[in-house]
Amino acid sequence: MPLQPFKTSNLLTMGVELELQLISLSNFDLTAASPDILELLGRSSFPGSFTPEITESMLEIATDVHEEYEQLLKQLFHIRDTLVAVGDRLNIGICGGGTHPFQMWSDQRIFNKTRFIEVSELYGYLTKQFTIFGQHIHIGCEDGNQALFLLHSLNRYIPHFIALSASSPFVQSKDTLYNSARLNSVFAFPLSGRAPFVLNWDEFSLGYFEKMEHTGIVKSMKDFYWDLRPKPEFGTIEMRVCDSPLTVERAAALACYMQALCSYLLENKEPLPHEDDYLVYNYNRFQACRFGLDGTLVHPKTYEQILLREDILTTLRRLKPYANQLNSTMALEHIYEITHKGSDASFLREKYAEHRTLESVVNESLKQFRSSK
């Protein structure tokens, strides 16, 4: 089946998807509660959309399409409050975080949905290990060529989003020494990584995608787990590298950071993307996952070594006029605060040092999600 035409969207509109953890309040482990929560959510109106995820201890929510920060944040608050209220009725906690600190993948149950069962049969144990939690950010594009230009222009900024959103330092009761350990699980899948370097939509659709479809490896764009991928049915590009933040404020701020970056890039403020930009892509990605804001990058054009934190601060200064135009100044102030106060990964490690139990770390995550304002 050919790839559908790229739908025209209003430029720089945005939407957010969040994968959230469902927590048993008796032991703070994950709990297979999504069937019950989905049933309860389906009985009344919901300020967005909700869907199951691949295992039953996960829930995905999505916002509507928005143009500005305040609209997006308002809806995320409404979604959060609705989820918390439903969770309270079922005695289920809900929180962000890219990984649960001590859950065992073998305990997870695959959600009873045809696609999830097919994925489980194909990938085996990797499917249950995919009980990880990310934020996906969509930015509207006017056509497929523009989408591919932005997708490849953003490649050098991927480490920014990994480090700023990092919230997965613990896996199966161990400190991994990574700030974002979640992405290591994604990288295990054969269709992960980055998109092929193609800047023309017809070439991507009729050339690359059709060839991949004819191999029998893929059926749709959903089969690609790329860090950034086009979504022709929505008319967007979708960034998939972010851990789910602990608060919805951070989720909104990250979306607006991407929106402002896209506005900046569309004015051709930087050299055009090139295949060779990806020579340092995996290394820079690793630096952001492992060291977070303290990582070191290699600039893909100059090969200069730069500090990740300083690169974000430099970028924020460049984006200031674009944030003003987009009414997202407060969102970028939040990004600035992360560079100075630390990421959610740092917060979680601090709470572990304070309480010395991972159950307490989960409890702190629950508090962060429900009490943020």
UniProtKB/Swiss-Prot annotation:
Task: Give the matching Pfam families.
Answer: GCS2
Q: Could you tell me what reaction this enzyme catalyses?
A: L-cysteine + L-glutamate + ATP = gamma-L-glutamyl-L-cysteine + ADP + phosphate + H(+)
**In Gene Ontology terms, what is one molecular function of this protein?**
glutamate-cysteine ligase activity
Asked whether the UniProt record includes Ligase among its keywords, one would answer yes
Swiss-Prot/TrEMBL keywords:
ATP-binding, Ligase, Nucleotide-binding
Q: Which residues form a coiled coil?
A: none
Q: EC number(s) per UniProt?
A: 6.3.2.2
Domain of life (superkingdom) = Bacteria
Q: Which InterPro entries does this UniProt record tie to the protein?
A: GCL_type2/YbdK_subfam (IPR050141), GCS2 (IPR006336), Gln_synth/guanido_kin_cat_dom (IPR014746), YbdK (IPR011793)
The answer to whether the entry has keyword S-adenosyl-L-methionine is no
EC supergroup of this enzyme: ligase
Single biological process term from Gene Ontology: modified amino acid biosynthetic process
Which PANTHER family does the protein's record reference? GLUTAMATE--CYSTEINE LIGASE 2-RELATED (PTHR36510:SF1)
Q: Function of this protein?
A: ATP-dependent carboxylate-amine ligase which exhibits weak glutamate--cysteine ligase activity.
Family per record: Belongs to the glutamate--cysteine ligase type 2 family. YbdK subfamily.
Q: What is this protein called?
A: Putative glutamate--cysteine ligase 2-1
Organism source for this protein?
Legionella pneumophila (strain Lens)
